[in-house]
Regions:
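Short connector loops/turns at beta-strand edges and beta->alpha or beta->beta junctions
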Residues: 3, 76-78, 170-176
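GHKL-type ATPase core
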Residues: 4-141
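GHKL/Histidine-kinase-like ATPase module
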Residues: 57, 85, 96, 103-105, ...
Length: 236
């Protein structure tokens, strides 16, 4: 039996994906077969599932190399192609979609190395994604074709009540804002309370600075949220 849950206790959701303990279980249910290799406690373990059912229970198949640990998951999605009775009628994986998502993860987890290989064609595609610098490097990548208004990326990191924040800001000479929000590596396409709070804070801080400097009275300047975010690239 695949156990994907157990993260509710001990503060696990501070760092986990929060898929309600169904991640690999759902992948298994929607696969023709799924193989697991686990290196742990000096041993290599193996289990196999077909159409969601266990066909080879977890067993030790060998020794692990000194210090070797980790998990390898291999699966074949359940298919209706070529007369199959599976789930999916189209198994044309998008390399670009996978590459973009894995690149996000490589930026968000500074120093990690992710390799993506596509062996479906005569000319294989093999990409290694590895970045140092975290969200700062992410922002520089997003703005690589734009003219920055600041020499350095503004990076803010903090921790409060067990919640960690990692924020990078950089303004460029465009009129558009690019704001990417993530929670535990999961993209928040529609933002969230942390995005709303950030926008409100940015507007308040800029307005407060203009007022305290006297520039607002002198030039009769009133800054809106849209003004503060014009040309801003942000990863939160």
């Amino acid at each position: 039996v695949l156990h994907a849950g157990g993260k509710f206790g001990g503060g696990g959701y501070k760092v986990s994906g929060g898929l309600h303990g169904v991640g690999v279980s759902v992948v298994n249910a929607l696969s023709e077969w799924l193989d697991l290799n686990i290196w742990r406690d000096g041993k290599e373990h193996y289990a196999r599932f077909e159409h969601g059912d266990t066909v080879e229970h977890l067993r030790v198949v060998g020794d692990a190399a000194p210090g070797e640990k980790g998990t390898e998951v291999r699966f074949l999605a359940s298919s209706k192609v070529d007369g199959g009775t599976g789930t999916f009628s189209n198994l044309d994986y998008s390399f670009k979609t996978l590459e973009n998502r894995l690149r996000e993860l490589a930026f968000l987890n500074s120093g990690v190395v992710i390799r993506l290989a596509d062996l479906r064609h005569a000319e294989p595609i093999d990409v290694t994604l590895h970045y140092e610098g975290g969200v700062e490097a992410f922002v520089r990548h997003l703005d690589k074709s734009k003219q920055p208004l600041l020499k350095d990326v503004i990076v803010i990191r903090g921790k409060k009540e067990g919640i960690e924040l990692d924020l990078a800001l950089w303004w460029n000479d465009s009129y558009h804002e690019t704001m990417l929000c993530f929670t535990n590596n999961i993209p928040q396409r529609d933002g969230g309370t942390h995005l709303s709070a950030f926008r409100a804070s940015l507007t308040r801080v800029m307005g407060g600075y203009i007022e305290s400097s006297g520039a607002g009275k002198k030039e009769k300047v009133s800054v809106s949220g849209e003004d503060a975010r014009e040309g801003l690239t942000c990863v939160l």
